[in-house]
């Protein structure tokens, strides 16, 4: 009975070790799952490339996050122009100054 418990415990330790090695090899860790704070680099060009990965609920095109407006001139959703938005931040960007 005692040896079977030892065998089960040893098997669990080996499985956890193998799983940890696999996750660390493919780059999955708690640090990679944290969404970066992009507010300081949030502009029309998104200077921080890490922020571009987190266009939550937004479209991504040509290096920027885009937000579709609700309705523009009764156009279907596919034909509507997209408005650039900050990644990680729900505020609308102001137009670039000339």
Curated annotation (Swiss-Prot):
Belongs to the DEFL family. It is found in: Secreted. GO terms for cellular component: extracellular region. GO terms for biological process: defense response to fungus; killing of cells of another organism. This is Defensin-like protein 68. It comes from Arabidopsis thaliana. InterPro entries: Defensin-like_dom (IPR056373). Keywords: Antimicrobial, Disulfide bond, Fungicide, Plant defense, Secreted, Signal. Residues 1-19 form the signal peptide. It comes from the Eukaryota. Disulfide bonds join 38-88, 42-65, 51-86, 55-87.
């Amino acid at each position: 009975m005692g040896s079977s418990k030892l065998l089960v415990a040893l098997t669990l330790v080996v499985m956890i070790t193998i799983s940890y090695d696999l996750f660390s090899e493919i780059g999955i860790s708690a640090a990679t799952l944290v969404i970066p704070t992009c507010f300081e680099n949030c502009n029309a060009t998104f200077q921080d490339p890490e922020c571009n990965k987190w266009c939550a609920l937004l479209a991504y095109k040509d290096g920027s996050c885009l937000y579709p407006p609700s309705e523009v001139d009764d156009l279907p959703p596919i034909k509507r122009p997209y408005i650039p938005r900050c990644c990680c931040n729900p505020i609308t960007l102001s137009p670039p100054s000339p």
